[in-house]
UniProtKB/Swiss-Prot annotation:
HAMAP family: UvrA. InterPro entries: ABC_transporter-like_ATP-bd (IPR003439), ABC_transporter-like_CS (IPR017871), ATP_grasp_subdomain_1 (IPR013815), P-loop_NTPase (IPR027417), UvrA (IPR004602), UvrA_DNA-bd (IPR041552), UvrA_inter (IPR041102). This is UvrABC system protein A. GO terms for molecular function: ATP binding; ATP hydrolysis activity; DNA binding; excinuclease ABC activity; zinc ion binding. The gene is uvrA.
Length: 944
């Protein structure tokens, strides 16, 4: 290969079979192949892992102890490596304090902008706050009641870390006798040793006065002294009154509302200086929700209308409720909705000061008499949630609470002072509510004075450049205050991508995992141009991707396969996309060249009158839309990123159905009415969340096939002779499991400030079971051997047991024949977890009254895997059930019976129904972006 290259020899991570490959440097390299073929093992677990490990090895021993020891990948040699950065989908922060603006560091620059050129205004009078003179301060203090005792304090240290010994010594030398340290008055010579790792506030007591006539001169002199000491700031400690704060810098001349010096930390909702004191900077408060407390208002109190007070092992609350109703003459057999407002108010908010006496039965069967004020259901739930030491009680009470915007900051997260500062016409809380597209326009057209312009010029350049990168990767619809926990994997990855371009590093190896996820075809070109821009800076990009356009745009394409799991792990073909297309061995090449394809179905299923109707959908950006979801067909919901697909399907359709059918406590998005639910009795949301969060969960336990396998082992002669029941073969209970590792097969070693290390259990060698259990075999294999089989191997092994074979076959049908039965749930990718869930539904008997909801099921799937997935989904529909999919993949869209296309744009520009109908009807709609891209695909792939 001409030019510099990365040479990999003998890569054996996971299923790789000693792979040797040479990759060109400073190029856009795309790795593709079937799900489970080994492409991620080559890209992430070999090339990235070694690049990262070598970089960490070059650091000092001190720095390395914080980064942890990185294992050397199973590879002979890798030459030509650069420092590596991985941009995958797993590292989205779920921290509620993390937003799009903070993750991209745009917020840091916006805070700096507001601190440097912001103009504070009084929130009560709308007057710009300017500096106060000493005379104004004197006048304000003299307004206090006569004989009021005051202390004038000079705040020399305000909430800063350090022991501050030198400063305290200097204050003493200047002749000052007293200080107020962390709200305690102390003698300057008796200040206790301050913890240098904690924040402290130190104020010098400049003077002590009593407000009366004739103190003006002394007061003015003392104020001047304090202002000089504390750089223009003054605190007046009013004994038995509210403290006053003054500043030579900023205060309202009418009401004295004053803001200290503008600093970036004042605009941070993660700092006590900037956060709203009510919600601590979260913007939300957990409040009791009456719709969750009384889900069915047609019920009477005797029928259990107040759900959290349903009878338990103690009849405390039912007895209390009965007594309250007797005292206030509330009919317990009348539907709740027919009670008077006064009666509802007593039940929900309490009876005031009046005490109520009642006798209740305790858990031990004894009785007890109580006399108490009836606090009401709402305060009771709130109190038990906030004050109970029991985790269980708090969890139970949280079911009846909802996150609502904070009443003080109205969801803006910041203090009154921070929200009083404006740049142009907007405060910082209003600016971060903009979408990226609107924020970019705002900052590009911001009008500032010449002086402010010279101060803000560099800051604005940084803000605009970062916003431009986000705009260029198709994220213009996201708002800056959007919580990062609500972002999809693709969105989070593209945000990190934009952040990396902003850093403008060169000579770096970037490894990316399907950056096109969740991106509409329309925005793909922008993403590809971004990748090329990173390459042109002098970087090497290795992108694991299945997207047709990205593969064609690659400088170098690597097809890993030929199959998945044990049937994969080899490089089938590599070279330019054209070279791979001509390679007959390459499955990817055959699809790219058009020799293989997913056909458009010969006919579409008929749309009948059976449907779910949603009226007045208004969740997030949906604009009061009415939509029908036909039943017993395959419906695909399409639209550009941010057009409202998830709001319609996940927030409204799924949650509204789950609330009615599954009696779920989740609250759906805002809508007026939903009709047709009586035609369904089951709703299944098949998402990409893990099938379990512990190593104990695996595909065998999740699908239920492990129960049947344990039955088989319990029926063997050896098990019967020993008296072993089915439970003996469970690794979750005592008996048959290895007690050294409690059936985990691995032991966790806590490393304190290093990541926890997991090592195989030495007693059972990672087999999870004790020796006696492993002596029981079926067809020569013990239970641990079976868990180590791939699904495909197990299907052949149990082919004479129809019950087991049927369940395993569904895993094979969804393309998971390569995973092992005992593979830890935590090691499955999102796409694999989703297909395990799909398989576990497939083997259940169909009723024709079920609806399946899938959000981008093609994530992580090769086009050949998609072909298999479509067969499975069509099997579900053939049984009379309904499938609703959110999808951008044109191979899935073209096979739909019915399409609902949202748009036209993302964010505020979306939220309307652009078109509905068959793929052919959508393709004819000139206003639909989906239709524009669908039309050529339908013409190309239709059955001739």
């Amino acid at each position: 290969m001409k030019g510099p290259s990365i040479v990999v020899k003998g890569a054996r991570a996971h299923n790789l079979k000693g792979v040797d490959i040479e990759l060109p440097k400073n190029k856009l390299i795309v790795m593709t192949g079937l799900s489970g073929s080994g492409k991620s093992s080559l890209a992430f677990d070999t090339i990235y892992a070694e690049g990262q490990r070598r970089y960490v090895e070059s650091l000092s021993a001190y720095a390395r102890q914080f980064l942890g020891q990185m294992d050397k990948p199973d590879v002979d040699t890798i030459e030509g490596l650069s420092p590596a950065i991985s941009i995958d989908q797993k590292t989205t922060s779920k921290n509620p304090r993390s937003t799009v603006a903070t993750v991209t560091e745009i917020y840091d620059y916006i805070r700096l902008l507001y601190a440097r050129v912001g103009k504070p205004y009084c929130p009560y009078h709308g007057i710009e706050i300017e500096s106060q003179t000493v005379q104004q301060m004197v006048d304000r203090i003299l307004e206090l009641e006569e004989r009021t005792k005051i202390q004038l304090l000079a705040p020399v240290i305000s909430h800063r870390k350090g022991s501050h010994e030198k400063l305290i010594e200097d204050i003493g030398k200047k002749g000052y006798v007293r200080l107020r340290v962390d709200d305690e008055i102390v003698d300057v010579n008796e200040v206790p040793q301050l913890d240098k790792n904690k924040n402290h506030t130190i104020e010098v007591v400049v003077d002590r006065l009593v407000v009366k006539d004739g103190i003006e001169t002394r007061l003015a002199d003392s104020i001047e002294t304090a202002l000089e000491l504390a750089e223009g700031n003054l605190t007046v400690d009013v004994i038995n009154g509210e403290e006053l704060k003054f500043s030579e810098n900023h205060a309202c001349p009418i009401c004295g509302f004053s803001i200290g010096e503008l600093e970036p930390r004042m605009f941070s909702f993660n700092s006590p200086f900037g956060a709203c004191p009510t919600c601590d900077g979260l913007g939300q408060k957990l409040k009791v929700d009456l719709d969750l407390v009384i889900p069915d208002k047609n019920k009477t109190l005797n029928e259990g209308a107040i759900e959290p007070w349903e009878p338990t092992s103690s009849d405390f609350y039912p007895t209390l409720l009965k007594r309250v109703c007797e005292v206030y003459k509330i009919n317990m057999d009348k539907p709740y909705k027919k009670l008077t407002d006064r009666q509802k108010n007593i039940l929900m908010n309490g009876s005031g000061e009046k005490e109520i006496e009642f006798t209740f039965t305790q858990r031990n069967g004894g009785t007890r008499k109580r006399k108490m004020v009836f606090e009401g259901v709402v305060p009771n739930i709130d109190r038990r949630y906030h004050e109970s030491p029991s985790e269980y009680t708090r969890e139970m009470m949280s079911k009846y609470m909802t996150e609502l915007p904070c009443e003080t900051c109205h969801g803006k997260r910041l203090s009154k002072e921070a929200l009083s500062v404006y740049v142009g016409d907007y405060n910082i809380g209003e600016v971060v509510e903009y979408s990226i597209k609107n924020a970019l326009y705002y900052f590009e057209n911001l009008k500032l004075s010449d002086q402010d312009k010279s101060i803000a010029d560099q800051i604005l350049k940084e803000i605009i450049s970062r916003l431009s990168f986000l705009n260029n990767v198709g994220l213009e619809y996201l708002t800056l205050d959007r919580s990062s926990g609500t972002l999809s994997g693709g969105e989070a990855q593209r945000i990190r991508l934009a952040t990396q371009i902003g850093s403008r590093l060169t000579g770096v190896l970037y490894v990316l995992d399907e950056p096109s996820i969740g991106l509409h075809q329309r925005d793909n070109d922008r993403l590809i141009n971004t990748l090329k821009e990173m390459r042109d800076l002098g970087n090497t990009l290795i992108v694991v991707e299945h997207d047709d356009d990205t593969m064609r745009a690659a400088d170098y394409l690597v097809d890993v396969g030929p199959g998945a799991g044990n049937h994969g792990g080899e490089v089938v073909s590599s070279g330019t996309p054209n070279k791979v297309m001509k390679d007959k061995k390459s499955l990817t090449g055959q699809y790219l060249s058009g020799k293989k394809r997913i056909e458009v179905p010969e006919y579409r299923r008929e749309i009948t009158d059976r449907k779910i109707q949603i009226k007045g959908a208004k969740s997030n950006n949906l604009k009061n839309v009415n939509v029908d979801f036909p039943l017993s067909v395959l419906t695909v919901v399409t639209g550009v990123s941010g057009s409202g697909k998830s709001s319609l399907v996940n927030e409204i359709l799924y949650k509204a159905l789950a609330q009615k059918i599954n009696k779920s406590k989740v609250k759906p998005g805002n809508f007026d009415e939903i009709k047709g639910i009586d035609q369904l009795d089951k709703i299944i949301d098949i998402d990409q969340s893990p099938i379990g969060r512990t190593p104990r969960s695996n595909p065998a336990t999740y699908t239920g096939v492990f129960d049947d396998i344990r039955d088989v082992f319990a029926q063997t002669n050896e098990a019967k002779i020993r008296g072993y029941q089915k439970g003996r073969f469970s690794f979750n209970v005592k008996g048959g499991r290895c007690e050294a590792c409690k059936g985990d097969g691995i032991i966790k070693i806590e490393m304190h400030f290093l990541p926890d290390v997991y090592v195989p259990c030495e007693v059972c060698d990672g087999k999870r079971y004790n020796r006696e259990t492993l002596e029981v075999t079926y067809k020569g294999k013990n239970i641990a051997d079976v868990l180590e089989m791939t699904v495909e191997e197990a299907t052949h092994f149990f082919e004479n047991i129809p019950k087991i074979k049927r369940k395993l076959q569904t895993l094979v049908d969804v393309g998971l024949g390569y995973i092992t039965l005992g593979q830890q749930a935590t090691t499955l990718s999102g796409g694999e977890a989703q297909r395990v869930k799909l398989a576990s539904e497939l083997h259940k008997r169909s009723t024709g009254r079920s609806i399946y909801i899938l959000d981008e099921p093609t994530t992580g799937l090769h086009v050949d895997d998609i072909s298999r997935l479509l067969k499975v989904l069509n099997r579900i529909v053939e049984n009379g059930d309904t499938v609703v999919i959110i999808e951008h993949n044109l191979d899935v869209i073209k096979t739909a019976d019915h399409i609902i296309d949202l748009g036209p744009e993302g964010g505020e520009g979306g939220g309307t129904i652009i078109a509905t109908g068959t793929p052919e009807e959508i393709a004819q709609n000139k206003g639909s972006y989906t239709g524009q891209y669908l039309k050529p695909v339908l013409e190309r792939d239709s059955v001739e």
